[in-house]
Amino acid sequence: MLTNININKMNQLTSENETAKQIVSQLLENHQTIVSMISHEIRNPLTLVSSALQIIEIQHPEVINFHGWSQAIEDIEFMCNLLNELSDFNNGSTLHHSVFSLEKLLKNIAVSFAMSLDSINSNIEFTSKISLNSDNYTGDKIKLEEVILNLLQNAKDAVSEKTFTDSKGSIFLCAEKISDSIVISCTVNGCGISDDIVNTIFDPFVTYKTNGTGLGLALSKKIIEAHGGTLIVTSSDETGTVFTITLPV
């Protein structure tokens, strides 16, 4: 598995050596093909098994109480999610550009996220401040929405797992245009991350969440970098954790 340090070294090598660049490009292309083939071959029988279990559960509802039944269902769902995320990660650098209002997209996401918190009577305070003063942005709308939703969901999970004594957990989504860049930040109060985790948090298959695949943040970083931007994280016990996206305009 390549870490961010390995990738930086590889990028430096390929920028200095044309032959190395061609070799790495071919290896990456072969890797993507192999991953797609394996995912496809596994997904088909897994889908059949999942469908069969659903039919059994409908025809014989008593199986719900069988020992290990619910765990089997959860394991299959996890594998399906893993294959979907693996496929997304494999195609993370492939963008489908369109011109759209990034400000409107972010505001819609904020409204939907706030409604989702209300629907479960969450004790999480969510606020947003989105002011880009620009209607047109060129990028992959669907993948950028996926990144923001992933950051918000991670923030929600982090706050939900923490016990607050003096105040309730809060999430703040901010977006503004600074110079020639759009800066989007997601701040979670009181949920600090240790240095060890920060250093590996964007590495593929590294996860600190129960039933996590370890691909969400790795994919998010890949998508943002494909847009020519950056995704970084800063954290402390006092101020909490901030994920910051910077996109060129």
PLM regions with names:
Residues S15-S39, S50:
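Conserved HAMP-HisKA connector
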Residues A52, F66-S116:
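Conserved DHp (HisKA) dimerization/phosphotransfer helix of two-component histidine kinases, i.e.
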Residues I109, N123-D135:
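Conserved catalytic submotifs in the C-terminal HATPase_c
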Residues I193-P204:
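Short conserved segment of the HATPase_c
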Residues G216, S220:
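Short alpha-helical Gxxx[C/S/T] motif in the catalytic ATP-binding
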